[in-house]
Every structure is written in C-alpha cells, then in structure tokens.
C-alpha cells in the first residue's frame, strides 16, 4: 500500500508543488518514484509511480510530446515537472491529456535536489504504510 497523491502533497515539504491538471485524480496511489528524461523512459514504468522530469524530454526531443501523448499509459500516479528548468510553459497538450485521464500533473520548484524530493516521497509512502 502506498500514499495518495493528495496526502503526499499535504505534507509541508510539498507546499510549493502545484497541481495544474488532473485534480480529480488526487486519490491515485503512489508506491514509488520514477524519472522521465529519455525517449524510451516511459517503457520502464510499471505503474503507481510518481514520475519526475525536468522537462528536458519534452523540450529537447522533437516530436516526443506527440509520441508520449499517443502512447499514453495511464498507470502512473502523477507526473511532476520541475519549474524553470527546460520548459518555459507546460504544453497545453500535456495539460489536456492529464485532465482527460484524471491524473495529476504537478509542477515543483526548481531548487530542491532530486535526492531531497525522492527522500520526502519515500518518507510519505513508508509512514503511510506503517
């Protein structure tokens, strides 16, 4: 058993994380963490992950956004994009697909390290499971 996206986001550490789409899916379960930074990265998803990205995959690989949306597999808990990294603006197509599938699309501050964020997710998942 994991923790819901909504419960995780209610933890103080996540106060500057903002849900921009998929609000109806805040009850989705998180059991772990994954990253999406390379074109084949979506193949490694096994479900119920909170997927993090800097946005590099969408900014630097021409056509990947379309491919991602066409092959969208709604098994992950949510997607978190680091603000101010590679995307000036979250693509409208991404917002639409997350809203349509009721999967939270979340933005996070630029400053926290991946290790710090992953540790906080793990704390939330483990504390909720105990």
Tell where the protein language model's regions lie, with residue ranges:
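Alpha-helical/coil-rich non-catalytic "connector" segments in signaling and regulatory proteins
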Residues: 1-130
């Amino acid at each position: 058993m994991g923790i819901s996206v909504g419960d995780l986001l209610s933890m103080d550490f996540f106060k500057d994380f903002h849900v921009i789409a998929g609000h109806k899916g805040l009850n989705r379960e998180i059991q772990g963490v994954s990253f999406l930074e390379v074109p084949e990265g979506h193949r490694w998803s096994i479900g119920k992950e909170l997927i993090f990205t800097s946005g590099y995959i969408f900014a630097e690989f021409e056509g990947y956004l379309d491919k991602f949306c066409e092959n969208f597999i709604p098994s992950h808990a949510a997607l978190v994009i680091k603000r101010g990294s590679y995307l000036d603006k979250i693509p409208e197509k991404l917002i639409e697909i997350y809203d349509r599938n009721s999967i939270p699309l979340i933005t996070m501050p630029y400053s926290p390290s991946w290790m710090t964020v992953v540790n906080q997710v793990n704390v939330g998942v483990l504390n909720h499971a105990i």
